[in-house]
């Protein structure tokens, strides 16, 4: 099909638009999805959010296995969705292609880098959408757009046929606004049946809440209280020993060094044009020296080991997804960088450093703006987290 779905939303790619019909029947029969423009589709060029990228790359020979799995399960792909440039942003404002409309808060940004996928689900154009998450590129747009998002365990779902970003942290994720669909997509991509919820203990990450804006905390506190009442066994822990800012520094150093290692050849050869924010981040990434990288790696090994062993399979860690509601469209780049990106990544880096699965579930502020509450599980506990989503979203107290 040549038609771009709901073009006024600005969520879909036009230059390399492609739609695919289901290849078989299965649990996703009759459902529609969209795919972030980092997944390869045979016979089509992947755009990666930058016109110079698409211009300097040829059509792909194979389709990413995750896309094939969804088509095999009966879902139809309606199109590719916009991404931030080289996926190196959490804002969702693309200098070249514009900003998709956030249907949950139209005067605010959708978040990124899986901006088009989140906007397509929030705008009810598709039932679910594929994204990728490294530093928060599914979890943050999910809450800005008032929908559900998941980052699975690192290496749990193949990233073959997906443009690499920072492989130490890259995962495939997805969005949905319906909890049952959210879970069904998980069953297909994780190749595991749905399970009944198994939570013995809810753990509150108490060091994360002081980072959160008062208007967000005001909504989250009563929800936390109702969760504490629901799960009899709860405890509070200082998950980072008050070192979240340090953890973020480790995360961004490794992430930046891997992005630069992956992209420097192409940048030096083609001198692509980058928009504000992306350009500065890439310039900074190019300056990270080998000594800093090895320091970050040795710290990372220690943090990763601690986080991997932090939770039992039947324990869930609860924390805010982001410190603030989505900023207004057109917010100045420096404000975005300091108040939104850096502060959000202090929270988002926890699951990344641990390679842990995390879901974000939507709530709203007193003024009706979307925000989110997150749950992190032990490695491989995605189906339990998805069961939690199903269990909670249909409860009046949540």
For every predicted segment, state its role.
Residues 1-6, 11, 128, 134-210, ...:
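Structural helix-boundary/capping segments
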Residues 1-126:
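Gly/Ser-rich catalytic/binding loops embedded in alpha/beta enzyme cores
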Residues 31-51, 253-299, 362-369:
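Short helix-loop capping/hinge segments that flank enzyme active sites or metal/cofactor-binding pockets
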Residues 33, 187-256:
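Gly/Ser-rich, acidic/histidine-flanked active-site/gating loops
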Residues 35, 77-82, 130-132, 236-237, ...:
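General beta-strand structural signal in soluble alpha/beta enzymes
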Residues 36, 291-398:
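Glycine-rich, small-residue loops and helix-cap segments
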Residues 95-98, 146-149, 335-337, 377-378:
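Short, hinge-like loop/turn segments at secondary-structure boundaries
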Residues 217-237, 264-269, 293-314, 342:
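Acyltransferase
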């Amino acid at each position: 099909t040549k038609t771009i779905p709901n073009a006024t939303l600005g969520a879909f790619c036009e230059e390399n638009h492609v739609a695919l019909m289901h290849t078989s029947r299965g649990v996703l029969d009759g459902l529609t999805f969209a795919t972030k423009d980092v997944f390869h589709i045979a016979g089509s060029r992947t755009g990666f959010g930058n016109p110079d990228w698409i211009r300097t790359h040829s059509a792909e020979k194979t389709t990413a296995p995750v896309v094939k799995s969804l088509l095999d399960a009966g879902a139809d792909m309606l199109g590719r969705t916009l991404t931030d440039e080289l996926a190196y942003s959490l804002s969702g404002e693309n200098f070249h292609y514009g900003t998709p409309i956030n249907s949950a808060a139209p005067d605010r940004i959708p978040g990124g880098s899986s901006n088009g996928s989140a906007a397509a689900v929030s705008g009810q154009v598709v039932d679910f959408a594929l994204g990728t998450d490294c530093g928060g590129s599914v979890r943050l747009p999910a809450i800005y757009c008032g929908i559900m998002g998941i980052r699975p365990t690192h290496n749990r779902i193949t990233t073959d046929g997906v443009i690499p970003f920072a492989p130490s942290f890259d995962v495939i994720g997805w969005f949905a606004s319906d909890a049952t669909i959210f879970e069904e997509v998980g069953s297909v991509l994780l190749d595991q049946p749905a399970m009944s919820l198994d939570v013995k203990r809810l753990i509150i990450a108490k060091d994360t809440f002081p980072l959160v804006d008062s208007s967000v905390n005001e909504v989250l506190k009563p929800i936390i209280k109702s969760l504490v009442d629901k799960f009899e066994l709860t405890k509070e822990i200082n998950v980072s020993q008050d070192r979240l800012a340090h953890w973020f520094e480790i995360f961004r150093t490794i992430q930046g060094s891997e992005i630069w290692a992956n992209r420097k050849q192409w940048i030096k050869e083609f001198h692509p044009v980058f928009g504000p924010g992306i350009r500065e981040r890439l310039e900074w990434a190019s300056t990270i020296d080998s000594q800093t990288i090895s320091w970050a790696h040795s710290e990372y090994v220690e943090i990763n080991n601690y986080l991997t062993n932090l939770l039992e399979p039947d324990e869930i860690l609860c924390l805010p997804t982001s410190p603030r509601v989505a900023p207004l469209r057109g917010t100045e780049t420096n404000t975005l960088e300091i108040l939104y990106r850096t502060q959000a990544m202090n929270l988002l880096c926890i699951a990344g450093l641990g390679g842990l699965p995390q879901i974000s579930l939507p709530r709203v502020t007193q003024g009706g703006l979307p925000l989110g509450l997150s749950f992190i599980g032990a490695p491989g506990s995605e189906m339990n987290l998805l069961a939690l989503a199903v269990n909670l979203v249909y409860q009046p107290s949540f």
